[in-house]
Amino acid sequence: MNSLSFLNHEFEAFPSPELALTDPNGLLAIGGDLRPERLLTAYYHGIFPWFNADDPILWWSPDPRAIFIPGQVNISTSLRKYLKKQPWHFTINHAFTDVMAGCAQPRRKQAGTWITHEIQMAYRELHHNGHAHSVEVWHGERLIGGLYGLAIGQVFCGESMFHRETNASKAAMLLLQQHLINMDFKLIDAQVMNPHLESLGAKPVKRANFIQLLTQFRDNTANPAAWIPSEVTLEL
């Protein structure tokens, strides 16, 4: 029978993801902190933090796991036509803090957000250290969509996305896919399946299979040019 682990502020090791609870699905550990070293260790082993503002830090590794293989993100004919008509432009790593703030805004019918101030501060530090990255969608000078996540070797671990204009988050996802293909990334970790991710082409895989893929690609050296702040054209 699997049991929950409790982390302190000194102990960096995580239990094996195989020990995660089945109810709630994937809950592995409680406690610890959000220092860069602990966060990087978590993602390296297929674990991520996810908790509400009033909760302790909760660490997860769900089964199944939602993933994209770069090149398999869906784009319908209607979406392609729609995006071609938009005067939007795209950047990489130009506005990480603003993207996180956009993602942190509560969705409709949601009272709060899991992207707390504590989470934002922790991931800004990861960004400053070259581990966390953002994709931005602009309409003129206005940020209308984007996403952020972490790069672990040739794996991109997506965290959240947002939009302020219709389909802007989908455009950010397509831009991310294009960029990751160009930079020879092999896997996108989307964490937990939901209808929006499924509509974009995410696939559920068993946790053991995800860990196998992660292990295969996490130690590979990424293209050093991958996350230089840049303007990028979305090719449709």
Curated annotation (Swiss-Prot):
Belongs to the L/F-transferase family. The lineage of its organism: Bacteria, Pseudomonadati, Pseudomonadota, Gammaproteobacteria, Alteromonadales. NCBIfam families: aat (TIGR00667). GO terms for biological process: protein catabolic process. Functions in the N-end rule pathway of protein degradation where it conjugates Leu, Phe and, less efficiently, Met from aminoacyl-tRNAs to the N-termini of proteins containing an N-terminal arginine or lysine. The gene is aat. Keywords: Acyltransferase, Cytoplasm, Transferase. It comes from Shewanella sp. (strain MR-7). This is Leucyl/phenylalanyl-tRNA--protein transferase. It is found in: Cytoplasm. It catalyses: N-terminal L-lysyl-[protein] + L-leucyl-tRNA(Leu) = N-terminal L-leucyl-L-lysyl-[protein] + tRNA(Leu) + H(+); N-terminal L-arginyl-[protein] + L-leucyl-tRNA(Leu) = N-terminal L-leucyl-L-arginyl-[protein] + tRNA(Leu) + H(+); L-phenylalanyl-tRNA(Phe) + an N-terminal L-alpha-aminoacyl-[protein] = an N-terminal L-phenylalanyl-L-alpha-aminoacyl-[protein] + tRNA(Phe). SUPFAM superfamilies: Acyl-CoA N-acyltransferases (Nat).
